[in-house]
Amino acid sequence: MTDDGPYGPHLWDEPEEEAIRYEDLPTPASPEKKRVDAWTIVLGLFGGVLLGTGVTLAVLGFTGVFEEPTPPTNPPPPSLTLPPPTSSPPVVVESGNATEVAQRAIPSIVAVEVPSAFGLGGGSGVVYSPDGYIITNHHVVTGAEDTMVVFADGGRWAAEVIGSDPLTDIAVLRVARQDLTPIEIGSSAGLTIGERAVAVGNPLALEGGPSVTYGIVSAHNRTLEVQVGTTLYGLIQTDAPITRGSSGGALLDNDARLVGITTAIAVSDVGAEGLGFAIPIDMAIGVANDLIESGLVNHALLGIQGRTAFAQQDGAEYPVGVMVTDVSSPSAYEDAGGQVNDVITALDGAPIITMDTLLTQLRSRRAGESVTLAVTRSESSVDLAVTLGTQ
């Protein structure tokens, strides 16, 4: 962790040489360290919900700050045998405001409890299917041996970690319960900046059920280095308050449809607030389905090294695509006829203007999927049909 300086501690350290080939990583343009001024990116789970006497090094990797310890929680009371719950009809409401969105969503939001040697950690989760599958964050459950899920009706169930993916910070749990209310799945592709957003989670391990906050979609396609060597791509930024402990919760549109999984917040000592981040649901669902099917994620691999390409216009530089600096052999890109010095400008019609936008697109694709790349080669336009490889 870097020196505190005048604005408090930061997360970003000097970048190390990338030795991992699971991703098409950009070639660094300069040795400058990657940081965002006075901001610290905080993955919301353990940063504020560890109720013990210390914080592990793994937690520091996610938060970049030490948290003030609070007394450990009391152990849960002994289990009681309860009569079967009576079923109640689903809430029927119209779309249009945060109250209605909350009524639709709250039955599908859970608290995730992760005991540790340091106390009780926690986060949030979203019911994905009626037969017990729940989506949460990788950093919520990583290293967990025993995980419990608390539902909005008060039911507390043991959960199994089906699988977890650090590249997208998505994990899937399963409980032995067959009567769940799954969240309605929306699409992050159609989100527009300025439209309403509602965040639902379980902040600070507070009792009493999920918490609802309200704001707007502030930005698309944010890239955050949340710890050294771990970068999240394509994030949705929102000003709907997301407090620690809400990691793995829901970001909803105005029709109570799930458009993101809340994952990180930015905090600062200089007064600016309101930066929360969510994994787009179009990316999260593909990862979750892979985890449910096999426990592993079939991340797509193009097989190149590259960097953002710039063009001069009216005395200014503008990003125009990804310059291919190296092609692996064998690789999906080589098999499609790709060459060094190609400039990739689109993937299935979606503009590619920086390396980050290419990586964001690849995160949402699966190995074996066929895509079309628009490429500029020696001032000519070429379309490449690529079958994506696997990592």
Where are these regions (language model features)?
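Terminal targeting segments of Actinobacterial cell-envelope proteins
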Residues: 1-40
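Serine-dependent protease modules
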Residues: 3-8, 37-312, 326-329, 355, ...
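A short glycine-leucine-enriched loop at secondary-structure breakpoints
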Residues: 188, 250, 314-318, 331-343, ...
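PDZ-domain C-terminal substructure recognizer with occasional recognition of PDZ-binding tails
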Residues: 289-296, 334-339, 345-351, 357-391
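Charged active-site motifs of nucleotide-sugar-dependent glycosyltransferases
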Residues: 319-323
